[in-house]
Amino acid sequence: MTLDNYNIFGDEYLFSMPLSPLPKVLGTFDGIQSAPTLTTPTLTPTTLRSIEETFFEMTNDAPYQAGFKPPPLAPLVNNNNNNNNNGNGNGNGNGNQQQQQVFDCGASVMPGSDTEESNGSWADGQMNEDQSISDTSSGATDSTSYQNGHMMGNSGGGNGGGTGGANNFSNVLAAAGRNTNTSNSATPARRGGGRRPNRSANMTPEEEEKRRIRRERNKQAAARCRKRRVDQTNELTEEVELLEKRGENLKKEMELLNETKNQLEYFLQAHRPTCQKVRADMLSVTTCNGLIGPPALLSAGSCGSGSSHHNNNSNSNDSSSGTITGLDATLNSTGRSNSPLDLKPVPIDEDLLLHIKDEPLDGALDSSSSLDQDGPPPHKRFALPNIATLMTPTGPAGSLQTPVSGTAPHGFGSFPTTISNISSIHNGPTLNSLNKMPKERPNTLAFQRPFGGQMQLSVSGRAPTQIQGVPIQTPSTGTFNFDSLMDGGTGLTPVSGPLIPNCTSQNKHPLELPTPTTEPSKLVSL
């Protein structure tokens, strides 16, 4: 026999009873693993098994307890008649209708094909599998009382004044309370929920001890978990507080630094007007084609200087024209100019020249000294005459140290060796030439003005060919002379005179002596 054979949840029973009170009735059964509640009115396999066990227990009761069989018809009719006598006329019809439905339900619950022998055989098999009579006796009593109360109380449904299914459920609960038998089990009825009953009757003491130990261990593990969670929460809270304090300290430090910066800026602005400005002309150097010199001298040589820049921090360098500013302007001009550094003579007062004392050449001055390395290379240097005798008249009578003039090139033999109006020369000696003056000097100075507008020509109108007895060996000397073109070669060969020693060259510093390697070859320009 299965639950389907009973068919207690048939269409007639479900339509005759309201659906909402059903979970309340099933919730009172003992032994249900997952008892349905008001929010979950569904039937689970565990609930169905519990219901089957309950029905099995009810089949073992005595026949006088009615079980699944309806009571005799006559007493029920008499009871109904008695109730009709006490009730009103409107309740009679409703009472008869409910009685008919109850009898139909009883017929559907107890079909004629099932017999007590089949119920007994099914009960024997269930007895061997599970011994749960004592555990579920209270539930069985409740179920039996529910069946009896339902069948016995529906006959008096007319007392409710025609309220129908709701009054029937109230009568069922009232009948269940009146007909409840005493429970045969010592285990109290469960209040619902939970995985297992509080104590099983068939559990041995060893199993109970193991269960107790397991529960204690689980409690300790849960307590440790809670403690660990609390400790971790406290640590995170402390860390957050520490970070907040650190952020506040950083904000205060930033505010202090900003205040200090504002004060320093205010002091700087207040002190700036009192600072003395550096003179602009102290750091400015005028250049012309890579040469450094005073502005007056460079302007005489028709080389305009650019506008001066007053930038004390940056060093501007212009090799062609302009102004170099900065402390290292001379070094920048020397290293970055297009042409090598060349120091030119500057105008010197004539009265100052008269007070300069002639000193003999220092023979210990070697080529490695700093004075020897300054200035132009040897082939660009020239010796200056005796400063004390610059203004003396030229001629054999006024000369005390007449040099032995070297033989000029045969192409320049007709040129005079002096330049008139020597007093008009404004170019004086340089520092290097003053330091390297020979001991014996001539009393004449014949050379062209480097920055003069016109060449100083002699009376005959020809260019000079010698300076202090040293022949001029540059191509520009014979550029505009026909004899030099005819006698000096084809214009593609170097034009130079023979190297004839004289007094001037013998008394020169060894580094200033002309040698074939000191002067580069010069070509005549046509």
UniProtKB/Swiss-Prot annotation:
Record-given protein name: Transcription factor kayak
Keywords of this entry: Activator, DNA-binding, Nucleus, Phosphoprotein, Transcription, Transcription regulation
Alphabetical list of SMART domains matching this protein: BRLZ
Gly residues bias spans: 154-165
Region (Leucine-zipper): 236-264
Compositional bias annotation for Low complexity: 78-87, 133-153, 301-322
GO process annotations (BP): embryo development ending in birth or egg hatching
Subcellular location: Nucleus
Primary location recorded for the protein, binned into one broad class: nucleus
